[in-house]
């Protein structure tokens, strides 16, 4: 799923889109939802059963997007009690003084964006059980990817906020690239991530 589904990338080549806002578009051919399509296909190939929620939760209002996506997670858990892992796929935003930066993983074939895993904790004082278990899941995925592609992953980030991760025992936020990356760089990165992390995630849900 995508709490901020309109997150998009730097237009390049044929990937030109009508922007809804700065580096945002509701066109799912060009925003993070398209990257999610690639991840869903890659994880399915790793023999994981995948339900890809392509709903745009951050338009027309960005405010309240986590409340809306959280309500959707609850509905999915009621409908599919065996649901084990919920991935909220985003792209990062790295900028300073109006300069937009990109993340780069130098690979033998071609450069792509980097990927970051984000894990919420209970540091805010809000209810968030099993966050350490989610950290272990992130570490397992991170180790699997770094073994295959040492430069693909950014360090795991721990944050005080829950970002709806308290709703399941297997939640992950994945940030693919940043607003300075192109869509092609992001899709290349998420495919490599899924190919390497997919088997590790599959073992966790068995």
Question: How does the language model describe each region?
Answer:
Residues 73, 98-105, 157-162:
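Alpha-helical scaffolding within the catalytic cores
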Residues 153-206:
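Active-site-adjacent mobile loop/cap segments within catalytic or ligand-binding domains
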């Amino acid at each position: 799923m995508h709490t901020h589904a309109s997150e998009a990338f730097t237009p390049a080549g044929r990937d030109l889109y009508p922007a809804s806002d700065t580096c945002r578009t509701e066109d799912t051919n060009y925003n993070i939802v398209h990257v999610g399509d690639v991840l869903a296909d890659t994880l399915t190939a790793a023999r994981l059963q995948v339900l890809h929620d392509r709903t745009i939760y951050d338009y027309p209002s960005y405010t309240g997007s986590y409340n809306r996506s959280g309500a959707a997670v609850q509905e999915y858990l009621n409908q599919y009690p065996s649901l084990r892992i919920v991935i909220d796929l985003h792209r990062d935003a790295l900028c300073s003084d109006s300069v937009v930066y990109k993340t780069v993983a130098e690979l033998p074939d071609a450069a792509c964006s980097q990927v970051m895993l984000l894990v919420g904790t209970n540091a805010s004082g809000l209810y968030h059980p099993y966050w350490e278990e989610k950290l272990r899941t992130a570490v397992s995925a991170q180790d699997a990817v770094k073994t295959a592609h040492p430069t693909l992953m950014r360090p795991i980030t721990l944050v005080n906020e829950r970002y709806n991760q308290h709703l399941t025992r297997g939640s992950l936020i994945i940030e693919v690239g940043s607003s300075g990356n192109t869509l092609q760089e992001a899709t290349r990165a998420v495919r490599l991530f899924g190919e390497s992390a997919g088997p590790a995630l599959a073992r966790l849900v068995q």
